[in-house]
Amino acid sequence: MASKDFAIGMILSQIMVGFLGNFFLLYHYSFLHFTRGMLQSTDLTLKHLTIANSLVILSKGIPQTMAAFGLKDSLSDIGCKFVFYVHRVGRAVCTGNACLLSVFQVITISSSEFRWAELKLHAHKYIRSFILVLCWILNTLVNITVPLHVTGKWNSINSTKTNDYGYCSGGSRSRIPHSLHIVLLSSLDVLCLGLMTLASGSMVFILHRLKQQVQHIHGTNLSPRSSPESRVTQSILVLVSTLCYFTRSPPSLHMSLFPNPSWWPLNASALITACFPTVSPFVLMSRHPRIPRLGSACCGRNPQFPKLVR
């Protein structure tokens, strides 16, 4: 009983911390939008990332907490379909935005070379349309079949194989459409993870080469303090590594392989699924020694927000 109470407390704490962290960043970028008139392309990407993070945390954490308290039949059939759909779309948008951040940062730190200059200009110009079309509209359409494979606990589908998610059930009378849907989602995940891996390797290579060039020009007596571009790139590398780790963690794989997991793997999977949306805003803010105070903006003073990513 004490262990279950501890798990419930962990889920509730994660919901509160993750939601507040993402709300703070969303407020930050909304403040910049209304005071400066327009956000930079990367700022808009991070704004969409905070929205997607909040959707993942709320759509996964709240129903899982209710199920942990024993309220497994609290969601109706429509409620289960809606919660699962929002969660899948939010998680896909998180992955897409992380991919955008890594690719865009490669373009940014490589812009000193002539062949990247024109690409950077086009990236700044078309990044808004790319986010809206690819990360939201595309993922909304791709996941449109998710509600067809989810039902409430009290209205389970008569199928030979039903997945138990604690607060909802998943299954289908026909396995062929569901299999095609899984293949499509997996293909998109593999594509995004592949791009992030390639971009991360490129960032490491470019930073190493720039460091060697600086050492060659100024000698080895350099300050240990890294440049702003290096700190931003390191933050994005941590974000990408966190996303790749938690999306392929053992509890998440356990949920995919076993249709009816026990209580602990079920809640462990919920905790790990929401780890990236919870951690990512603090990773972005941690590179600044002084985080801007929310109260100063609420009181009408200019808090001098630093730019998280250039």
UniProtKB/Swiss-Prot annotation:
> Pfam families, alphabetically?
V1R
Q: Which residues lie on this side of the membrane: Extracellular?
A: 1-5, 72-91, 151-186, 259-263
Coiled-coil stretches, from where to where?
none
Cysteine disulfide links:
none
Q: Which GO terms describe its biological process?
A: response to pheromone; sensory perception of chemical stimulus
Which key words tag this protein in UniProt? Cell membrane, G-protein coupled receptor, Glycoprotein, Membrane, Pheromone response, Receptor, Transducer, Transmembrane, Transmembrane helix
Q: Which GO terms describe its molecular function?
A: pheromone receptor activity
| GO cellular component labels | plasma membrane
Which InterPro entries is this protein grouped with?
GPCR_Rhodpsn_7TM, Vmron_rcpt_1
* Localization terms from the record: Cell membrane
Asked whether the keyword Protein biosynthesis is assigned, the reply is no
Q: What does this protein do, in the record's words?
A: Putative pheromone receptor.
Q: What is stated as this protein's family in its record?
A: Belongs to the G-protein coupled receptor 1 family.
Its name, as the record gives it, is Vomeronasal type-1 receptor 3
- Native organism: Pan troglodytes (Chimpanzee)
Write the gene name: VN1R3
